[in-house]
């Protein structure tokens, strides 16, 4: 992609002929990446019947408009940042267009940092930064275009990302498994089946019935109820059906809707690899309920647990707190602080971020790790995202049990 003369310098991907779901557009740069990492990623996506597009055109300039149309027809974009990503102005132009479609709620972006640290991209440092400024010197873009390039880079870096650090021991094949899992999770939100046919849904409205069940009562006064949640009709949309879901109501709190997102419904890096995590049934469960599983960290050099929740299910004008429910066996590998992050729907508000010392949470009882707080209002209707992660320490961590995330009123 450092010019229009060779296939090796092309920024993106190949076409799968399996028309089974939303198209996935892959934006990347580099001959080495194409022959190495992409040789694992593309077949893995196709194996799961995921429709993938990778641009193979040699003469990029002639096909750029058509390529932009293809991006617009896609539902998911995988933006794969590597050290050589900024060697191509085609890649940067693609990224700008991808961001535009994301801002229009027409595209969901999954940023992937391949053998690259997030801060290197955000701060434009290291070889990645050198390549970016070399690109600027070479093409001398207009100030407006340069602003679009940097704005696209910084905006994408703020999204929930999959990161393979530069010196990580995790193999490309294992990293690909996490990417495929993330794509499949996003795909599930795009469609529902009616009479055997798939119908694509708008991103702003959940596509299927949501069931949120907390398997353990918060206290002796709590009871489980089933309710219907009537969604308001959004502008330029057809009436939206009611959605039935379950949650616990704490009778000691008049407004006490307590939501619990199980570990199985969170995104946990490497959780399907038995070398890193194992899934265990939660002890002392009610035999009449479906089995709830907890995740146990056996061994991993980095931690990444994240999830999302739609605030439309919450009580309006109520202060809520978000907490991870965990317990930790005694172990010395947790000497590096673990980071917590809460992103609210109103993008103009900065994410809530903090760090915690996991030694404070060593216990044989379930403990809450606070992530952040927010008040429900018309201004922040939409999806919140939360994460607990540690990507910097190369020590192999273990001994962490993850039960889930609780979202509850704070009084």
Swiss-Prot record:
Domain TIR, residue spans: 20-157
Outcome of substituting residue 188 to R: In strain: cv. An-2, cv. Bs-1, cv. Bu-0, cv. Chi-1, cv. Co-1, cv. Cvi-0, cv. El-0, cv. Gr-3, cv. Ita-0, cv. Jl-3, cv. Landsberg erecta, cv. Lisse-2, cv. Lu-1, cv. Pi-0 and cv. Sf-1
Coiled coil regions in record: none
InterPro entries recorded: PP2-like (IPR025886), PP2-like/Lectin (IPR052147), TIR_dom (IPR000157), Toll_tir_struct_dom_sf (IPR035897)
Stated consequence of mutating residue 108 to V: In strain: cv. An-2, cv. Bs-1, cv. Bu-0, cv. Chi-1, cv. Co-1, cv. Cvi-0, cv. El-0, cv. Gr-3, cv. Ita-0, cv. Jl-3, cv. Kas-1, cv. Landsberg erecta, cv. Lisse-2, cv. Lu-1, cv. Pi-0 and cv. Sf-1
Biological processes annotated in GO: defense response to insect; jasmonic acid mediated signaling pathway; response to jasmonic acid stimulus involved in jasmonic acid and ethylene-dependent systemic resistance; salicylic acid mediated signaling pathway
Gene Ontology molecular function, alphabetical: carbohydrate binding; NAD+ nucleosidase activity, cyclic ADP-ribose generating
Protein keywords: Hydrolase, NAD
Record-annotated active site: 94
EC number, as in UniProt: 3.2.2.6
Disulfides per UniProt: none
Effect seen on changing residue 89 to R: In strain: cv. An-2, cv. Bs-1, cv. Bu-0, cv. Chi-1, cv. Co-1, cv. Cvi-0, cv. El-0, cv. Gr-3, cv. Ita-0, cv. Jl-3, cv. Kas-1, cv. Landsberg erecta, cv. Lisse-2, cv. Lu-1, cv. Pi-0 and cv. Sf-1
Reaction(s) catalysed (UniProt annotation): NAD(+) + H2O = ADP-D-ribose + nicotinamide + H(+)
PANTHER family attached to this UniProt entry: LECTIN-LIKE (PTHR48478:SF1)
UniProt-recorded name of the protein: Protein PHLOEM PROTEIN 2-LIKE A5
Species lineage: Eukaryota, Viridiplantae, Streptophyta, Embryophyta, Tracheophyta
